[in-house]
């Protein structure tokens, strides 16, 4: 009997080493991948909300600088307004991508005319250059910004004036797409025709015959002013900016 108990003792003792081996592997696995220590620094605080006044100021700045798109939308529909916005977004407006050298060259090439000379075109338009521009020449489809004063020749009735005077608040310059109709705000076919032979920075006095003005019927403008039938029109037009349409 004693031998039997003695023989079984080593067999029974195998469970203890097995347990130690398992514990050893567990400890090894645990020690090879120790837990990362928790960071003692607190998370950064969230950014403070933007003040309402600052948001309103930013919105106001966008609205005040986008009057050209608004003007085009009112005159030619949302397509023209979106076209202008697209030009702004992709940076193809010539005034925005010009280098300082190009701007200085444009200014250097712009010159006042000492003595006005009458130029008579085959279609009956007469004009007198007061300043020869040194910038780009607008073509059909280009966006142009102009200052304009128009009056009925003979009566002197002023029906549009963006140059402004001491007694009258200056209107905003007019924006138009060259070659697009209908015309508004005192513009007519004769002015659209003359713009194509001018350059940015140029200023010209133009006499438009009735056939290229408001014709035999005359016109009633948005301001309520009446242009009489068969009226010849006298304009002063100055090109402030030419934004060449992308090819």
Curated annotation (Swiss-Prot):
Top-level EC class as recorded in UniProt: isomerase
InterPro entries, alphabetized: Chloro_FKBP-type_PPIase, PPIase_dom_sf, PPIase_FKBP_dom
Alphabetical list of PROSITE patterns matching this protein: FKBP_PPIASE
Transit peptide: 1-79
Function: PPIases accelerate the folding of proteins. It catalyzes the cis-trans isomerization of proline imidic peptide bonds in oligopeptides.
Gene Ontology CC terms, in alphabetical order: chloroplast; chloroplast thylakoid lumen; chloroplast thylakoid membrane; nucleus
Record's keyword terms, sorted: Chloroplast, Isomerase, Plastid, Rotamase, Thylakoid, Transit peptide
PPIase FKBP-type domain mapped to chain residues: 141-243
UniProt cross-references to Pfam families, sorted A to Z: FKBP_C
GO molecular function, one term: peptidyl-prolyl cis-trans isomerase activity
Region (Disordered): 26-64
Subcellular location: Plastid, Chloroplast thylakoid lumen
Protein name as catalogued: Peptidyl-prolyl cis-trans isomerase FKBP17-2, chloroplastic
Compositionally biased spans, kind Pro residues: 34-51
Catalytic activity: [protein]-peptidylproline (omega=180) = [protein]-peptidylproline (omega=0)
Organism name: Arabidopsis thaliana
Enzyme Commission number, as recorded: 5.2.1.8
Family statement drawn from the similarity comment of this UniProt entry: Belongs to the FKBP-type PPIase family.
């Amino acid at each position: 009997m004693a031998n039997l108990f003695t023989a079984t003792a080593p067999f029974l003792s195998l469970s203890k080493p097995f347990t130690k081996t398992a514990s050893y592997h567990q400890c090894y696995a645990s020690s090879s991948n120790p837990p990362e220590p928790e960071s003692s620094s607190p998370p950064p605080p969230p950014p403070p909300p933007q003040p309402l006044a600052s948001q309103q100021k930013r919105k106001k700045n966008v609205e005040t600088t986008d009057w050209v798109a608004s003007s085009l939308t009112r005159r030619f529909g949302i397509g023209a307004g979106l076209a202008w916005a697209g030009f702004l977004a992709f940076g193809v407006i010539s005034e925005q991508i010009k280098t300082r050298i190009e701007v200085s060259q444009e200014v250097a090439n712009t010159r006042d005319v000492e003595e006005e000379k009458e130029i008579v075109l085959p279609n009956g338009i007469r004009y007198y250059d007061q300043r020869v521009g040194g910038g780009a020449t607008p073509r059909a489809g280009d966006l142009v910004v102009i200052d304009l004063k128009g009056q009925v020749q003979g009566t002197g009735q002023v029906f549009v004036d963006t140059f402004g005077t001491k007694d009258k608040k200056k209107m905003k310059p007019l924006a138009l797409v060259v070659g697009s109709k209908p015309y508004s705000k005192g513009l007519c076919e004769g002015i659209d025709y003359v713009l194509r032979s001018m350059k940015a920075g140029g200023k010209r006095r133009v006499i438009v015959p009735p056939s290229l003005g408001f014709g035999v019927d005359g016109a009633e403008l948005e301001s309520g002013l009446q242009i009489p039938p068969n009226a010849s029109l006298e304009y002063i037009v100055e090109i402030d900016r030419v934004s060449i349409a992308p090819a």
